[in-house]
């Protein structure tokens, strides 16, 4: 009977290989712990995954079946490194441009409006503490944004001078990407409190 045979085969496979099945969240810390327990590598990024292409085990495997030679694998790894570096470079420069030419000028303009509002409310003899607090918060985040922008500009420029390939792509991953995240943090906070009419681009809510 075909169905019986299939069920029997499935049962056999499940019994033999149950230990490799993980039904939890593969993106959670639970999987990180489980992978370590099983002796599996926890590769967190593309840059850290590329070297797997040129390990002795990979070279032997692809060579054994006539898929790729060692030189071909090394060439593919090099291309992946270069593509990654180019992609992050484009993203970093776009981020710098948006922050410098759109976000910071818009926030500067808004802080002036807030400052004028604080003065007007005080002159009217009313409590301007809320407006003053908003102004202080936004000014603080604006300072953080400018500092983060300078850092991103510096590391992006430094990355351009690195040796192309593995060295450069690793620098982009371990230095430029964190600097990008460092710029995004205060900008995200600003987006939550700056007047929507002033913000120069669609918000997460709009999207």
Predicted regions, residues:
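Single-stranded nucleic-acid nicking/binding segments centered on His-rich, glycine/basic loops
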Residues: 7-11
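Flexible, glycine/charged-enriched surface loops at secondary-structure junctions
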Residues: 1-5
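C-terminal amphipathic alpha-helical interaction region
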Residues: 12-207
């Amino acid at each position: 009977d075909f169905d019986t045979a299939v069920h029997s085969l499935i049962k056999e496979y499940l019994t033999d290989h149950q230990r490799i099945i993980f039904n939890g969240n593969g993106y959670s810390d639970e999987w990180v712990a489980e992978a370590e327990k099983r002796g599996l590598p926890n590769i967190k990024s593309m840059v850290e995954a590329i070297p797997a292409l040129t390990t002795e085990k990979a070279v032997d495997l692809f060579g054994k079946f006539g898929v790729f030679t060692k030189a071909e694998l090394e060439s593919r790894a090099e291309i992946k490194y270069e593509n990654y570096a180019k992609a992050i470079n484009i993203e970093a420069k776009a981020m710098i441009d948006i922050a410098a030419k759109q976000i910071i000028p818009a926030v500067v303009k808004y802080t002036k409006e807030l400052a004028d509002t604080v003065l007007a409310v005080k002159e009217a003899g009313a409590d301007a503490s809320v407006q003053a607090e908003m102004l202080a918060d936004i000014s603080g985040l604006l300072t953080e944004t400018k500092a983060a922008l300078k850092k991103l500009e510096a590391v992006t420029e430094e990355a351009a001078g690195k040796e192309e390939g593995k060295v450069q792509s690793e620098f982009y991953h371990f230095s430029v990407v964190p600097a990008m995240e460092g710029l995004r943090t205060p900008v995200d906070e600003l987006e939550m409190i700056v007047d929507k009419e002033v913000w120069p681009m669609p918000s997460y809510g709009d999207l």
